[in-house]
C-alpha cells in the first residue's frame, strides 16, 4: 500500500493525494494550484496519473484549492464516484461552475490577444459543461457514517469546522487481510466559530496526513466573543462617521459569518442605530452560497445556530438587500448616507468590490473593514499596509477612509489548535505527513510535534511512500530542487508582471489626458521590474 503526494506538498494549494492498493487507486481531493504555483506541474492540465484508472475521489471540502481540478479530472477520463458531505456537494454545485466560467473568460481573453498576434487559439482548462459533468458524479454522505468506497476501501467523514460541510476523512484500506486506517485532516477550523460545529478529531489513525497552513502562527484574537465585540465596535464607529461601511469578503463562508453577526447584533440591540442602516450583499456567488447555508439542516449547524434558525431564515432581516444583477450593483454606488456593503472578492483582486472601493476609499466618512487574509501583492494587502493612494480600474484613488482589520475571522486552526487536534487522537499515529503549508509553517509545526514524540515526514511533490516497507520513491517526476523552485517562482512573477503591464497599457490607450502621465509612470515601473526578472 502506497500514498503519493500529488499536490500541496511544501505549498498551500492544489491538495491531491493518491492511495494505491492491491485493488487500484483512489484520490483524496483534486485541487487547483494557485498563486506562484498556478503554472507549475499539473497546474496547466497534466496529471501525474491516468484519471481513468482512479476508482473513486473523496473531497474534504469545497474550496477550489481542494476541488478546482475535478472538472478537468472528469474531462480527462475519470468516471468514478465522488464522495463528499452533502453540504460540500451543494457548495461544489455553485463553485465549480463559477470556476469554469473564470477558465472560459481567461481563455477568451487570451484568444483575443493570440488572434491579433497570429498565434494559435487556446482552449479553457475546462468548461461549464465539464463542471456539470463532474457534478453528476457527486454522492453526498452524512457525517460519521462508515461507507463503502470500493472493494477493500471504507471511509468516514468527520466534521472539522473549517467550512460548511468540511471534513477530515478516515480511510480504511484492507490489503492482505490487514486493515490500515489513513486519516486526511483536510483544512482544520477553529473552536467557537459561528454557524458550524467545532472541529472533531478522528477516533484513531495509523497514518495521518495533516495540514499545516498556520503551523508557525498563533491567532491574536482567541475567542469568538472577542471577534464579535471587535466587529460590533467597528460598526458603531462606522455608523457614527456617517459614511458607507465597505467589507471585502470571500463569497463562501466569510459572507455568511458577517450576516450571522449582523443579525445577532440586530436581535440583541448590540449596535445602536444598526436597524436603520441598509445592508447590501453584492456578490452573485455569495448570494447563492448564503441560500445553501440557510438551507442546511442540523447536521452542519452548532447548537446556537440551531436555536437562531428556528426563528426563521438564518440570515434574513428587514434591512438586508441583495444585488444579483449588474444594474442592482451599480445602484448601490448612487446611495447616500451610511450603508453596509459586503462584496467579493475578499482580497479585492477582482469582482464588484473594486467598484465599491473606488467609490468610497476617498471619502473621509467611509470605513473599509478587512475580515480575511490579504496575500502579498493584492490590492487588499496594499491598502492595509498603509498606502496613501491606490489605482483601481485605471483611476488613482486617494485613501481618506478609515481602514480596519479583524484577524479573528480566520478559518484555519493555528499552531496550538493543530497540536490540540492531533493530541486528541486516542492512539499515536505511526507517521504524520505534513502538507498544505509553506516551509516555515511546516518546519515550525514539525518541531513542535517531534517534541511530543511524533514521527514526522515532510513529503516533496510526487513523492510516494510505501506504508508497508517505509521506502520512499520519487515517482512521476524528479524531485524539485531549490534552484528549480526559484526559476518557477521567477517565471510566475514574470507572468504576473506581464499581465499587469498589458492591462495597464490597454487602459492607457483609453485614458483621459490627466491620468495618462500617471499610467505611463506605472507602465515604466512594470517594464523595469520585468527587465530585472529576466536578467
Where are these regions (language model features)?
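A polyampholytic, Gly/Pro-enriched intrinsically disordered region
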Residues: 103-108, 297-311, 391, 473-496
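Core dinuclear metal-dependent hydrolase active-site scaffold
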Residues: 1-52, 133-197, 331-334, 340, ...
Amino acid at each position: 500500500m502506497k500514498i503519493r503526494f500529488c499536490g500541496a506538498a511544501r505549498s498551500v494549494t492544489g491538495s491531491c493525494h493518491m492511495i494505491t492498493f492491491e485493488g487500484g487507486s483512489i484520490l483524496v481531493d483534486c485541487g487547483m494550484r494557485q498563486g506562484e504555483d498556478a503554472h507549475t506541474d499539473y497546474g496547466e492540465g497534466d496529471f501525474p496519473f491516468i484519471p481513468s484508472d482512479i476508482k473513486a475521489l473523496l473531497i474534504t471540502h469545497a474550496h477550489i484549492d481542494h476541488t478546482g481540478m475535478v472538472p478537468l479530472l472528469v474531462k480527462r477520463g475519470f468516471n468514478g464516484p465522488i464522495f463528499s458531505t452533502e453540504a460540500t456537494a451543494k457548495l461544489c454545485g455553485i463553485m465549480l461552475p463559477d470556476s469554469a466560467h473564470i477558465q472560459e473568460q481567461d481563455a477568451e481573453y487570451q484568444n483575443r490577444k493570440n488572434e491579433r498576434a497570429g498565434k494559435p487559439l487556446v482552449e479553457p482548462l475546462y468548461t461549464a459543461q465539464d463542471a456539470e459533468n463532474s457534478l453528476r458524479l457527486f454522492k453526498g454522505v452524512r457525517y460519521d457514517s462508515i461507507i463503502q468506497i470500493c472493494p477493500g476501501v471504507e471511509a468516514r467523514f468527520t466534521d472539522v469546522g473549517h467550512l460548511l460541510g468540511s471534513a477530515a476523512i478516515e480511510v480504511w484500506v484492507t490489503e492482505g487481510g490487514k486493515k490500515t486506517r489513513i486519516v486526511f485532516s483536510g483544512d482544520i477550523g477553529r473552536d467557537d466559530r459561528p454557524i458550524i460545529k467545532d472541529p472533531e478529531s478522528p477516533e484513531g489513525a495509523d497514518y495521518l496526513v495533516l495540514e499545516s497552513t498556520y503551523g508557525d502562527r498563533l491567532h491574536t484574537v482567541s475567542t469568538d466573543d472577542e471577534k464579535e465585540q471587535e466587529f460590533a465596535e467597528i460598526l458603531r464607529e462606522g455608523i457614527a462617521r456617517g459614511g458607507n461601511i465597505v467589507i471585502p469578503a470571500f463569497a463562501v463562508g466569510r459572507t455568511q459569518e458577517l450576516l450571522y453577526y449582523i443579525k445577532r447584533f440586530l436581535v440583541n440591540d448590540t449596535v445602536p442605530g444598526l436597524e436603520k442602516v441598509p445592508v447590501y450583499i453584492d456578490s452573485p456567488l455569495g448570494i447563492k452560497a448564503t441560500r445553501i447555508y440557510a438551507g442546511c439542516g442540523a447536521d452542519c449547524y452548532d447548537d446556537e445556530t440551531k436555536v437562531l434558525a428556528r426563528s426563521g431564515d438564518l440570515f434574513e432581516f428587514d434591512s438586508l438587500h441583495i444585488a444579483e444583477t449588474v444594474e442592482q450593483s451599480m445602484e448601490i454606488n448612487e446611495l447616500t448616507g451610511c450603508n453596509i456593503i459586503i462584496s467579493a472578492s475578499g482580497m479585492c483582486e477582482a469582482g464588484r468590490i473594486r467598484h465599491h472601493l473606488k467609490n468610497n476609499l476617498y471619502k473621509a466618512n467611509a470605513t473599509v473593514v478587512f475580515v480575511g487574509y490579504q496575500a502579498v501583492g493584492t490590492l487588499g494587502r496594499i491598502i492595509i499596509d498603509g498606502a496613501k493612494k491606490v489605482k483601481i480600474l485605471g483611476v488613482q484613488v486617494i485613501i481618506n477612509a478609515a481602514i480596519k482589520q479583524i484577524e479573528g475571522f480566520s478559518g484555519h486552526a493555528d499552531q496550538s489548535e493543530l497540536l490540540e487536534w492531533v493530541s486528541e487522537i486516542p492512539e499515536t499515529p505511526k507517521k504524520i505527513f505534513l502538507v498544505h503549508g509553506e516551509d516555515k509553517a511546516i518546519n515550525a509545526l514539525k518541531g513542535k510535534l517531534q517534541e511530543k514524540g511524533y514521527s514526522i515526514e515532510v513529503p516533496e511533490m510526487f513523492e510516494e511512500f510505501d506504508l508497508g516497507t517505509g521506502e520512499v520513491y520519487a515517482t512521476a517526476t524528479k524531485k524539485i530542487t531549490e534552484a528549480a523552485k526559484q526559476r518557477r517562482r521567477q517565471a510566475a512573477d514574470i507572468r504576473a508582471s506581464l499581465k499587469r503591464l498589458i492591462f495597464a497599457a490597454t487602459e492607457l490607450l483609453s485614458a483621459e489626458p490627466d491620468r495618462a502621465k500617471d499610467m505611463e509612470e506605472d507602465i515604466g515601473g512594470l517594464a523595469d521590474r520585468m527587465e530585472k526578472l529576466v536578467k
